[in-house]
Swiss-Prot record:
Family: Belongs to the FAD-dependent oxidoreductase family.
Catalytic function, reaction form: 2 monodehydro-L-ascorbate radical + NADH + H(+) = 2 L-ascorbate + NAD(+)
The keyword NADP belongs to this UniProt entry's keyword annotation: yes
Signal peptide coordinates: none
Cellular location(s): Peroxisome membrane
Record topological domains on the Cytoplasmic side: 1-3, 480-488
Record's GO cellular component terms: chloroplast envelope; peroxisomal membrane
Protein's name according to its UniProt entry: Monodehydroascorbate reductase 4, peroxisomal
Membrane topology: Multi-pass membrane protein
EC class (word): oxidoreductase
Residues noted as binding FAD in the record, renumbered to the chain: 12-15, 39, 46, 51, 145-146, 296, 314, 344
PANTHER family listed in its UniProt record: APOPTOSIS-INDUCING FACTOR 1, RIESKE DOMAIN-CONTAINING PROTEIN-RELATED
Residues that span the membrane, as ranges: 4-24, 459-479
Length: 488
């Protein structure tokens, strides 16, 4: 027995939900679209799992964070899918895919065929066993990738109040889970091999400010070392962790966040794999024209930097999903996916956003002493390529986004750039209007050339310099095509 659909989305994470919403808005007919997911629930916003889901009071629970509430859009409950004629095949694993025949075989033995396939399989959490450490199956060792993981972690947290937790990893999951554990009145020690937290993105100066705040909340840091083994009680529950530097840490709970690996195994040998993900073009189309890939599993061209990237963040998942559906449903009017890499996080009283690429010379600016509002620029080969801001307003975040998208030449020295701070970004934007990047660029969009910014007088955050006169053609373009870019 088998079923046939025009469109099949394989995977049930964030990207799948946003793709489904885009399909309905582009006129998909009842019965044409199917979503196949190993999870037993409809697509949901994964960021909630390390934040609201772990709160000790009034924690977030489904259906409150089904997609697409994370972008202030519709909440896609199971009823929504039914009302729109979308087939949800949940709790089902696909054990093989035949790209040439355009078929999928489920673990139940059902064959599902498609005309177009969107791969939204995401990624899996790396396990300690892959690094030679046994014991991940202990009841108080927790990962956090899906709803089942979150439920397990929440249960262990409830039984560990005033106890000791060891968080392995200093990235997104480690930092956000550590904050949640503190809120739950658990003593936290973070362990990671790098010199500072969020090493792939933060500079040492930025990291030190966040680490100092965490320390003030009682969090301890052990850096430059790794976990080597666990100690267990008679019930095979972890009681302590041993580190390579000889440290011995008591543990009632262990949270592991040591990275992810894209779920590409079904397509290896059938589609081109690059940088760990499925290689796609600027329309999110793989080496097979009927197969698209979106979200964490996709390696796509980032036009701003002229190279292939695989990005692990919810914003990329949301926007790549919309673009892939646009390319399938309206190929003539859909242009290239012109994505500006974007990362953000909210922990304790902090809220930061980053745009672009954290490479090149770093210039810090703002009020690092009080930790309320500060930022950084990354300058590579004389151009602005990355911007970070903590504690900004919505308008300030939009400004650094637009400035980074322009990739302007920096003609002032770095010391002056530090003094200018946010004023530099304001000047970039005021001197040259940016055709704001749409979630789904149209084929008619014209790529604007990089701007050159020359600043003669110091500026302050609240005083944007007077913009230069923009050519009439550019002004007309901005009028017709410019519209506010959504950041949430």
């Amino acid at each position: 027995m088998g079923r046939a659909f025009v469109y099949v989305i394989l995977g049930g994470g964030v990207a799948a939900g946003y793709a489904a919403l885009e399909f309905t808005r582009r006129g998909v007919s009842d019965g044409e679209l199917c979503i196949i997911s190993e999870e037993p629930v409809a697509p949901y916003e994964r960021p909630a799992l390390s934040k609201g889901f772990l709160l000790p009071e009034a924690p977030a629970r489904l259906p409150s964070f089904h997609t697409c509430v994370g972008a202030n859009d519709e909440k896609l409950t199971p009823k929504w899918y039914k009302d729109h004629g979308i087939e949800l095949v949940l709790g089902t694993r696909v054990k093989s895919v035949d790209v040439r025949r355009k078929t999928l075989l489920s673990s139940t033995g059902e064959t599902i065929s498609y005309k177009f396939l969107i791969i939204a399989t995401g990624a899996r959490a790396l396990k300690l066993e892959e690094f030679g450490v046994e014991g991940s199956d202990a009841e108080n060792v927790c990962y956090l990738r899906d709803l089942a993981d979150a439920n397990r972690l929440a249960t262990v947290i409830q039984s560990s109040s005033n106890g000791n937790a060891v968080v392995i990893g200093g990235g997104y999951i480690g930092m956000e889970c550590a904050a949640s554990l503190v809120i739950n009145k658990i003593n936290v020690t973070m362990v990671f091999p790098e010199a500072h937290c969020m090493a792939r993105l933060f500079t040492p100066k930025i990291a030190s400010l966040y680490e100092d705040y965490y320390r003030a909340k009682g969090v301890k840091f052990i850096k430059g070392t790794v976990l080597t083994s666990f100690e267990f009680d008679s019930n095979k529950k972890v009681t302590a962790v041993n580190l390579k530097d000889g440290s011995h840490l008591p543990a009632d709970l262990v949270v592991v966040g040591i990275g992810i690996r894209p779920n590409t195994s079904l397509f290896e040998g059938q589609l081109t794999i690059e940088k760990g993900g499925i290689k796609v073009n600027s329309r999110m189309q793989s080496s097979d024209s009927s197969v698209y890939a979106i979200g964490d599993v996709a390696t796509f061209p980032v036009k701003l930097f002229g190279e292939m990237r695989r990005l692990e963040h919810v914003d990329s998942a949301r926007k790549s999903a919309r673009h892939a559906v646009s390319a399938i449903m309206d190929p003539i009017k859909t242009g290239d996916f012109d994505y500006l890499p974007f990362f953000y996080s909210r922990v304790f009283a902090f809220s930061w956003q980053f745009y672009g690429d954290p490479t090149g010379d770093v210039v810090h600016f703002g009020e690092y002493e009080d930790g309320k509002s500060f930022g950084a620029y990354w300058v590579k080969k004389g151009h602005l390529v990355g911007s970070f801001l903590e504690g900004g307003t919505k308008e300030e975040y939009e400004t650094i986004s637009k400035a980074t998208q322009l990739k302007p030449a920096v003609t002032i020295d770095l010391e002056e750039l530090e003094r200018e701070g946010l004023g530099f970004a304001h000047t970039v934007v005021s001197q040259q209007k940016v055709p704001e990047v749409k979630d789904i660029p149209s084929a008619e969009m014209v790529k604007q050339s990089a701007s050159v910014v020359m600043i003669k007088k110091p500026l302050y955050v609240w005083h944007a310099a007077t913009g230069v006169v923009v050519a009439a053609s550019v002004a007309a373009f901005a009028f017709w095509y410019g519209r506010r870019r959504r950041r949430w």
